Amino acid sequence: MIEETLLEAEEKMEKAVVVAKEDFAAIRTGRAHPAMFNKIVAEYYGAPTPINQLASFSVPEPRMAVVTPFDKTALRNIEQAIRDSDLGVNPSNDGNIIRVTFPELTEERRREYIKVAKAKGEDAKVSIRSVRRKAKDSIDKMVKDGEVGEDEGRRAEKELDDTTAKYVAQVDELLKHKEAELLEV
């Protein structure tokens, strides 16, 4: 019973780290990266659709991305979605592909993106701590109900704390790398 609770908590913490990784990947740096387009949604036959399902992405140069729609009729909508996104870019289309050139980030923009990254990192840590709290409550209830002994409960809480610390450290490490990437000129 306790092992199941600990495993479930660890899985949820792992998911929080994965979400943080995806969020960090979507934050723009000085370089073009296909993951930057993951959260952008375009209108496609009347339905909002993520553009990573409507096109392929390549990065021929460090500050340029090329978006190739699978369906040419979606070209204008994809271009508009990229233009309206918070990437701060002005895409150009030649009728077949969309070229997205990323201007050099100003120091002010870099600082803004670092703040965004820190907020996303904090969200991930709050999520991890929330999972810990729920698992701890579950363990405390098992001890109180007599399903497991107090020693077993303390051991499980120690293991839970170690797991929590491990995943919080992973988020901190991801954040540190993202900050370094953003400050790199």
Curated annotation (Swiss-Prot):
InterPro entries: Ribosome_recyc_fac, Ribosome_recyc_fac_dom, RRF_sf. It comes from the Bacteria. GO terms for biological process: translation; translational termination. Signal peptide: none annotated. Residues 137-162 are annotated as: Disordered. Pfam families: RRF (PF01765). GO terms for molecular function: ribosomal large subunit binding. Its main location: cytoplasm. GO terms for cellular component: cytoplasm. NCBIfam families: frr. Responsible for the release of ribosomes from messenger RNA at the termination of protein biosynthesis. May increase the efficiency of translation by recycling ribosomes from one round of translation to another. This is Ribosome-recycling factor. The gene is frr.
